[in-house]
Amino acid sequence: MTYRPDIDGLRAVAVIAVILFHLNTNWLPGGFLGVDIFFVISGYLIGGILYRELSTGTFSLKRFYLRRMRRILPAFFAVVVFTLIVGAQLMVPGSDEWNTARSSAKWSVFFGGNFFSALNTDYFAPTVEVQPLNHLWSLAVEEQFYFIYPLILWAIMGIIKRILPPASSSLTRCVNVVLTALAIASFALAFLPISLHGTALVPYYLPHLRFGELLIGAILAVAVAQGNLQPSAKTATFVGSLSILVLIACLVLPFPNTTPWFPGFAAALPCIASAGIIYAGARPYWFASALSHRAVVFVGKISYSLYLWHWPLLAFAHYALGRELSNTVLAATALLIVLLSLASYHLIEQPLRHLQWSFGRTGLVYYLLPTLLVAGLYMQGRKMPTEMEQFVSCGVPRGTEKVLTYTTIGKQNNTPNVLIVGNSYTIQLRDFFDKVAKAEGWCGILSGVSGTFPHHLEKQKPISREEFQKIYDNISLTGDWDKELNNLRSQRIISDLPKFKTIIISLNWWHPETYSKALPEVLSTIGFLHKQGKHIIVVNSCMSYNTARLAETYCSVRQKTVTLSALQSENYLRGTAYHLGENRVQATKQAINTRFPQVEWLDLVPFIPHSLLHNGKSILCNPTHINIYGANYLADRFIESGQHLIAPVPSSHSR
């Protein structure tokens, strides 16, 4: 294939779009589509090579993957190793962020990082900004495509050649009809949601929804392979100009990024525009000339290194500072991205790409040995220092661990007569309730199941402790296991309900789903408990804050100096999400008090310090949960205030 400098120029457009979007989403709202441009370019270049080699009988699967290893692996492993080494020093051992980085590295070396992301991360969620290897999802998708596409194309061409007469000129047309059908099917599959063990997969990362984008490039490559689909100068100018206008509009304007349209049929628009630019670039016209400028081409040549290095550096900056990055920090980070990318391109990517080693030696040095190094780094720092646990944990097990908390708190020699019930926002307050109960001289049962609230108690049947334990042990982490846990918890509650005089309900009242979906169930449960003569207290314990990074906590524990002036701004800490949540909390309080004026309301948010810090240490383990240290701090503040959670004579007024 003749070298096309304009295609390297288009690579430059793609990588700049992605980096600008990640620097600040407002700068280029559709910048995430740069990845889709990369997919089209890849499909065109590699798809074209595959088609020509299969057509001439010169294709070798071994040679194909040898080229892929030389092209992809050296810089890829350099970034993964760098990320694990830096992450081990910067991130809190055992924290969600560090565990996610390690797991992402593990999945990525097997080119399955997109599946890990699909199980855990919304691409557009704020939490992504501190996940340093999340961007490797696109590389995984591309490699998954090339694991199967050579075989699919070989099969398609073989079948068509058997059907058509020898030397038929219809081969190209027939191949493209099949590839087009596959591309349309890929986009259409976005209308079929997929879940694994009851967990919905994030469509953004799924390969079968992205293969259509690579196929658009491959379809163009097949169409032009015979040399009879070359544009005239006039056609090139028209198609190229129209395509660049469409692509600019997609990048500059807010682009739909939700299922089922993206990924899906909406992605076809920027992809077809990218293919149009590639098609038109076969003839010199104004934009092809601009893309072929030496400076633009050079950016395109180092685009792979730029893409690999930009996200870990930005993620570490977000993590270390725990706040929105200033323009000065962004500029410094951008400079570091360029410098590391240049070093990577000249010292790693290019020298190792051109070593003419055998397939076995290349696989050993480029893949197996680096994978063993990553495995060694993965095994390091797995345990959290004991002194860190109270800052990093909110008492809620991470991941999909089966958890049903049903534990005694408070004065242990008393009979439990208080039930504290809810989800993770109940579990996070275990130390708060335990310390307050001991100070007030009562004993209770704390029951929490992450993400759920007991409902339909009136329909539950009592269950013995033996039955409870047997059912619990047999619940497997498949299907709707969380609902099974909640149902089992409800049965346990109804069994013990007669001995409880007071019921305390603690949920994430600020969350939109709690307000829209869970509140009717809560009101129904309160009504049932009220009929049973129970004294009911509703607790609001936390909100959604703009920051709760653990970097400042980690530095404080290590006795390092930390500048937290940027965290002192109430406007920053308590942003849009906080104020919207505050409105939902007040609406919830009003809804409960309107129907059940005798229900008490205890708001712990006023006890949370303005800076979210106490003695220089964070009281939150993430933007929405109090850590163990914070729960003890709130208990001390509450006790010092002179208030009572369980007063000697239950009060009928709202706290």
Residue ranges of predicted features:
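Extracellular/periplasmic envelope-modification machinery, especially enzymes
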Residues: 256-258, 320-331, 335-342, 346, ...
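Membrane-interface helix/loop caps of multi-pass membrane proteins
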Residues: 1-357, 654
